[in-house]
Swiss-Prot record:
Cofactor-binding details, from the entry: Binds 2 divalent metal cations per subunit.
Gene name linked to the record: ldbr
EC number(s) given by UniProt: 3.1.4.-
Transmembrane residue ranges: none
Organism: Drosophila melanogaster
UniProt xrefs under SUPFAM superfamilies: Metallo-dependent phosphatases
Activity regulation text: Active in presence of diverse metals including Fe(2+), Zn(2+), Mn(2+). Binds two metal cations in two adjacent alpha and beta metal-binding pockets.
Subcellular location: Nucleus
Region annotation Disordered: where it falls in the sequence: 242-275, 501-534
A molecular function (GO) term: RNA lariat debranching enzyme activity
UniProt name for this protein: Lariat debranching enzyme
Length: 534
């Protein structure tokens, strides 16, 4: 399989696909798959654009909206991860991945998929130590703080990826793993980027959690971006590290009891697919999409035969990991800790590499692992004809939305959507799945909602709403409910009673006796009115 790898896309999809077309023409070959290492910028409209963490002067719609609207179609299956310049609201709708446009697939906060037998894993975002131990507490509309923290890597995704067993052919990240420059031409890198020297000396260049993942997962290829330069490295692995040294260097390393549990799971787990050993990881970072920049690389990876278009499938082991770690999701802003090495007696499971039984349970839920092509447009796309002057327009951030793809995926697997959890944790109503508008944040009576949907004419006043809820159709003419003829009831009575007005000369039909409460209200009202007239 021939795979094109892109560094930072920065929304330039048309240019990237044109470059691939040029490579195909010159080389007389066919590119089967495009992988993008973040800063994808899947902005559908101006509202999405407001959630990108960049200075206002750099906000640009670019060309993704054309693929979202259907004006253009991605000519090659495209898989991407998130970076630090994204339409964060849209990506947050798809925490476990999904289609952002036809033939363009997002891996989620972290994910593992298979394309014709090529196993691809990835993690979105960049590392910031002050947010790493927090939950996914952000939701739109974002504050100045949360519009940045929303794309910061969290410990849960790293923890989940460490549970993977067997081979991983390709790993995608936006950040670089810490220390990766020691395995390549460091001197040449410093000539290109001399200001990297200070961060190298302080150990701040790159992501420590990604370094741990590199040692734990040991993929054949690792592709990254973010630092806007091309850099290659070869990282040798001692295979005893995979369940040893890599774990001891991790913040969630195992105790002796956990090691025993891991040995049991290893014996119970199915044998991973046969593959050649991976003595080294081939690391490659690429630049952003600009002229005369090294932003695209084509690699050839062994795969199953491709008949027609490549086949995108869920990874059964990853599904089982998501299911078994669902209880570890946090949507709180405070720090929390995952199962691992700790003082005292070991009481909690910390190894979630799936057993045979867990894999069987997942495959029973997903009888076909092929990812369904269930993309839906849930918001209007950008219209350049009507919004050409958008850089001078004032646009609010979008309201929070739920995506039908995530709803289907979570329901099938039996897990929670983190976006739903954070809304509920903050006392907000869940918006309709796929709707363009968020529901009222005020709690409404379900009966009232049903009446509002059934009534042909709009209900204008609160009185009319209560009338429809509390009484059958009136048998007499509607009463005059002007301000001077209405009295205020106590709040508790107002929820159940009807605001009554004086009708002194009309007798109730014998067949429909008036309720005692209504008579009492009429007498009390009449006394009040008479007192006022006197």
């Amino acid at each position: 399989m021939k795979i094109a790898v892109e560094g930072c896309a920065h929304g330039e999809l048309e240019r990237i696909y044109d470059t691939i077309e040029g490579i195909e023409k010159v080389g007389g070959t066919k590119i089967d798959l495009l992988l993008c290492c973040g800063d994808f910028q899947s902005t559908r409209n101006l509202e999405d654009l407001q959630t990108m963490a960049v200075p206002k002067k750099y906000l640009d719609m670019c060309s993704f909206y054309k693929y979202y609207s259907g004006e253009l179609v991605a000519p090659v299956l495209t898989i991407f991860i998130g970076g630090n310049h994204e339409a964060s609201n849209y990506l947050q709708e798809l925490p476990y991945g999904g289609w952002v446009a036809p033939n363009i697939y997002y891996l989620g906060y972290a994910g593992v998929v298979n394309v014709n037998g090529v196993r691809i894993a990835g993690i979105s975002g960049i590392f910031k130590g002050h947010d790493f131990l927090r939950g996914h507490h952000e939701f739109p509309p974002y504050t100045d703080s949360t519009c940045r923290s929303v794309y910061h890597v969290r410990q849960l995704e790293v923890f989940r990826l460490k549970q993977i067993s067997g081979r991983v052919d390709i790993f995608l990240s936006h950040d670089w793993p810490t220390g990766i420059y020691e395995y390549g031409n460091k001197a040449q890198l410093l000539r290109k980027k001399p200001f990297f020297a200070a961060d190298m000396e302080s150990g701040k260049l790159g992501s420590q959690p990604l370094e741990e993942l590199l040692k734990a997962v040991q993929p054949a290829y690792w592709f990254a971006a973010h630092l806007h330069c091309k850099f290659a490295a070869l990282v040798p692995h001692n295979h005893s590290q995979k369940l040893g040294d890599a774990e001891s260097s991790s913040s969630s390393s195992s105790s002796e009891d956990e090691d025993e549990e891991r040995e049991k799971v290893k014996k119970a787990a199915p044998v991973p697919p046969p593959s050649k050993s991976v003595p080294v990881t081939k690391f490659l970072a690429l630049d952003k999409c600009l002229p005369r920049r090294a932003f695209l690389q084509v690699v050839e990876v062994p795969s199953d035969p491709i008949e027609g278009t490549p086949r995108l499938e869920y990874d059964a082991e990853w599904l089982a990991i998501l299911h078994s770690t669902n209880h570890l999701i946090s949507v709180k802003e405070n720090y929390y800790y995952l199962p691992g090495k700790k003082a005292g007696e070991f009481t909690e499971r910390s190894n979630f590499t799936p057993t045979e039984e867990e894999l069987e349970a997942v495959t029973a839920k997903f009888q076909k692992l092929q990812v369904p092509e269930n993309f839906e447009r849930t918001v209007p796309a950008f219209d350049p004809a009507e919004q050409s002057d958008y850089k001078h327009m004032f646009v609010d951030q979008p309201k929070v939305q739920l995506n039908p793809q995530s709803n289907t995926f979570c329901a099938t697997l039996g897990i929670d959507d983190p976006l739903c959890l954070v809304l509920l944790a903050n006392g907000l109503d869940l918006p309709a799945v796929g709707a363009t508008e968020c529901k009222d944040r005020e709690t409404k009576s379900s009966k009232l909602q049903a009446v509002e949907e059934d009534v042909a004419e709009p209900l204008v006043t609160p009185t009319k709403r209560k009338l429809n809820l509390s009484l059958p159709a009136p048998t007499t003419a509607a009463a005059d409910t002007t301000d001077e003829n209405v009295i205020d009831l106590p709040e508790e009575e107002a929820e159940e009673a009807i605001i009554a007005t004086e009708t002194p000369h009309v007798e109730e039909p014998a067949s429909v006796p008036a309720s005692p409460n209504v008579k009492k209200l009429k007498r009390r009202n009449q006394n009040i009115y008479q007192a006022q007239e006197d």
